[in-house]
Amino acid sequence: MTKSLDDAALATLFTEARTHNGWTDKPIGDETLMALYDLTKMGPTSANCSPARFVFVRSQEAKEKLKPALSSGNLEKTMAAPVTVIAAIDSEFYEKLPELFPHADARSWFTSSPAVAEETAFRNATLQAGYLILAARALGLDTGAMSGFDKGKVDAAFFAGTTWKSNFLINLGYGDPSKLFGRLPRLGFEDACVLA
């Protein structure tokens, strides 16, 4: 890959993209959610481990299950979003490695070291959720990621008896630009980077 994206694509993904707090009532169809995952899954992970799992919360019943776990500042915008993604982590992601990394016994790397498995799962699932945000923008969707929620309540409501645990939430839909805040500053290169 030697060709750079044009300015319009970079604007869609980064420079003009915003974290949204308000939403239009335009729905998101199943085919769009499937296309979103199909892009997300192509992002690289360590040993192709792919530990992220995603729950697309969209029915009223599922929203009501999620509601008690939300912080007050995230309640209204989350209930209004067409979809809220629970970006989760499968702690036993390594059970899929014979399929995902068949040329080596990668499963044993993680079953022999729970600490390495936990660290790998968290790092790579978070990375995959970042890919999902960029994939959503590439498909014309807006996002609003949040960590203001009660993980224990989400896990009890959605993941009881499973190896999945919540990481963070991402509201998904078509943003209402009138609800945007002014863009906040970002650190300059000299504050965040070192050339070594």
UniProtKB/Swiss-Prot annotation:
Keyword presence, NADP: yes
A Pfam family this chain is assigned to: Nitroreductase
InterPro entries, alphabetized: Nitroreductase, Nitroreductase-like, Nitroreductase_HadB/RutE, RutE-like
Keyword Flavoprotein listed: yes
Cofactor field: FMN
Enzyme class: oxidoreductase
Family designation: Belongs to the nitroreductase family. HadB/RutE subfamily.
Name of the molecule in the record: Putative NADH dehydrogenase/NAD(P)H nitroreductase Atu2496
Gene source species: Agrobacterium fabrum (strain C58 / ATCC 33970)
